[in-house]
A protein has these predicted regions:
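Conserved ATP-binding subdomain of kinase catalytic cores across diverse folds
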Residues: 1-78
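Conserved kinase catalytic-core segment
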Residues: 17-32, 82-145
Length: 145
């Protein structure tokens, strides 16, 4: 769950718009078959909330093993970090990540750039361990900021 500062303030009003834009970004990705968390917006007179289902949970008591891309890069990719796509392509070349998951990370990077997201750091993409179909599933902060 994310929420805005109080509405009626410059930060609150800006964050309200960003949270709504993030929900729209998730809806666009879902409509095109990209596995993303279900998310909805709840607006009140005081705040805007973005409520999402965690992608790393299984039922009420379980969890998928996810690792942030920054940790995976540090463990397996020599050299400095460039972007999600470069790291995932290097992992695919090492056969540590399915090629289609690397392509999905590249598409997510391009989508983020298209919507003006300048916050695509390596903590905002996680890899699901042991699930090739969902390997690049963990996406955070798709807001155009």
């Amino acid at each position: 769950m994310k929420f805005s500062p109080p509405l009626g303030t410059p930060f609150g009003d800006r964050w309200s718009i960003l949270l709504q834009a993030e929900a729209l970004a998730l809806q666009v990705l879902a409509a095109h078959g990209v596995p993303v968390a279900d998310a909805r917006i709840l607006c009140s007179d005081q705040r805007t909330d973005l409520i999402s289902t965690r992608y790393d949970r299984i039922g009420t008591a379980g969890a998928r093993h996810v690792v942030p891309l920054d940790a995976v890069h540090d463990a397996f990719v020599p050299g400095p970090r460039r972007d999600w796509a470069a790291t995932c392509q290097a992992l695919a070349a090492q056969r540590r990540l399915p090629v289609d998951a690397a392509a999905q990370a590249s598409a997510l990077l391009q989508f983020g750039r298209l919507i003006g997201n300048t916050d695509m750091h390596f903590g905002n993409l996680s890899l699901v361990v042991g699930s090739p179909a969902d390997a690049a599933r963990g996406r955070f902060s798709l807001a155009p900021v």
